């Protein structure tokens, strides 16, 4: 299904080759460091470092912009409010801090395959065994959810069509109730199918 | 009744089976997908893209009211894990680790206790949770807890004071109140059409069926 591939940009840069766990740990350290950096000059250096990292990764300007784009108005509003309540340097540093943290997180997303991140998460889930949770069931839960998204989306399209046929396009209730009931029916049939294939034995 | 044909059920197998049976895996994954799909029709932008108003919080409240406490929290957790892994499952096709570094991170994390509290209050209502109880559950879990988690994080990220952030967030309150009412109406309608959508009824049926 389109749109479920994530934002990964293929490439062979050193950032692409780093293991997912290392990148996530690095991201956590960098985001904490950003919160501690106060003077605008230090944040300007951080901005240069982030830009250099993007250049090294070679993901391209379009992909980079797509990561930061969703917060552009927010950054502008934050800058304006900070300019009023604080001063110029405060406004610059707090806006930069937010944008840089998002850009760094976006860089990890752009250079890491979804499958690699999922594999890393599954390894992290392994200790769940000691809490009585089966890591296999948890990873089944994740992949079953991915599979269910197109199924439920298809169900939503059918409900929309039925709604149009009934002439109740404007009623949110006439959309949501059949959708939720349909999703539940599908879920319970799926659960029985899994049980019938011996998942609970 | 459990029929085991060819192999004995060992002690290691028992706990995991009790904790996450096939029926729960199916319901949790389909509801996580439902919350994702409710983000598809597009977001109603009030404030640019700051904290988009979406139908996804409606999905969170519905998950709580229908799946019960821990299953709904698990459904939200599964969705957030997939989002963190880079899948564009949030409203407007957002996804990736960036959303957890952004100003609305706290609202997303707040979905977890929010769904759980909604489920907990509905579960206290037993086999026939009333409309007022459902509404209270959606308001407390889907609005109260989510704001309680979201506002401090937004204040921390933006460096604005708590009061100013709360004032900014208040613009979303009318939309969220409407969504809580809508969630109540939809959950009631669903439970009337499909009684198994009431957490207590579902649990009783599982117990009676021995599964």
Regions found by a protein language model. Give the residues of each.
Chain B
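Helix-boundary and loop/linker segments of multi-pass membrane transporters
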Residues: 17-21, 50-51, 91-92, 96-97, ...
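Peri-membrane helix termini and adjoining interfacial loops of integral membrane proteins
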Residues: 3-7, 84-89, 158-163
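Short helix-perturbing small/polar motifs within transmembrane alpha-helices
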Residues: 4-15, 37, 97-146
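Alpha-helical transmembrane segments in multi-pass membrane proteins
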Residues: 30-38, 60, 64, 75-83, ...
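Membrane-embedded alpha-helical hairpins and interfacial helices in multi-pass inner-membrane proteins
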Residues: 49, 125-211
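Hydrophobic transmembrane alpha-helices
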Residues: 2-73
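Residue-level signature of transmembrane alpha-helical entry/exit and packing/kink sites
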Residues: 20, 24-31, 53-60, 72, ...
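Alpha-helical membrane segments and adjacent membrane-interface helices in multi-pass membrane proteins
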Residues: 42-117
């Amino acid at each position: 299904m389109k749109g479920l591939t994530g934002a990964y940009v293929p490439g062979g840069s050193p950032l692409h080759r780093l293991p997912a766990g290392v990148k996530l740990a690095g991201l956590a350290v960098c985001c904490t460091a950003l919160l501690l950096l106060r003077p605008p000059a230090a944040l300007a250096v951080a901005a240069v470092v982030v830009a250099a990292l993007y250049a090294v990764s070679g993901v391209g300007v379009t992909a980079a912009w797509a990561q930061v784009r969703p917060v552009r108005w927010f950054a502008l509003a934050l800058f304006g409010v900070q300019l009023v309540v604080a001063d110029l340097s405060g406004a610059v540093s707090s806006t930069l801090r937010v944008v840089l943290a998002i850009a760094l997180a976006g860089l990890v997303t752009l250079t890491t395959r979804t499958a690699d991140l999922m594999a890393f998460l599954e390894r992290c889930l392994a200790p769940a065994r000691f809490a009585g949770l089966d890591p296999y069931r948890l990873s089944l839960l994740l992949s079953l959810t991915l599979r269910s998204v197109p199924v439920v989306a298809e169900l939503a399209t059918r409900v929309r069509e039925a709604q149009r046929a009934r002439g109740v396009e404007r009623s949110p209730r006439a959309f949501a109730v059949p959708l939720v009931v349909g999703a539940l029916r599908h879920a319970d049939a799926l659960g029985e199918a899994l049980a019938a294939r011996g998942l609970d034995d | 009744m459990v029929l085991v044909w060819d192999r004995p059920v060992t002690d290691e197998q028992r706990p995991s089976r009790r904790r996450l049976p096939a029926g729960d895996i199916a319901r949790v994954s389909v509801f996580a997908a439902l919350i994702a799909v409710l983000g598809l029709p597009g977001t109603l932008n009030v404030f640019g893209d700051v904290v988009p108003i979406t139908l996804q919080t409606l999905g969170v409240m519905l998950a709580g009211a229908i799946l019960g406490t821990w299953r709904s929290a698990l459904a939200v957790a599964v969705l957030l894990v997939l989002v963190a892994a880079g899948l564009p499952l949030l409203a407007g096709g957002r996804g990736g680790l960036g959303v957890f570094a952004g100003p609305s991170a706290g609202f997303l994390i707040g979905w977890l206790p929010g769904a759980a509290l909604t489920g907990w209050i509905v579960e206290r209502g037993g086999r026939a949770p009333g409309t007022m109880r459902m509404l209270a559950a959606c308001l407390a879990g889907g609005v109260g807890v989510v704001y309680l988690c979201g506002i401090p994080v937004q204040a921390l990220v933006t460096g604005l004071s708590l009061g100013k952030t709360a004032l900014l967030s208040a613009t979303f309150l009318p939309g969220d109140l409407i969504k809580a009412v809508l969630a109540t109406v939809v959950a009631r309608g669903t439970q009337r059409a499909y009684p198994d959508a009431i957490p207590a009824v579902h649990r009783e049926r599982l117990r009676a069926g021995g599964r």
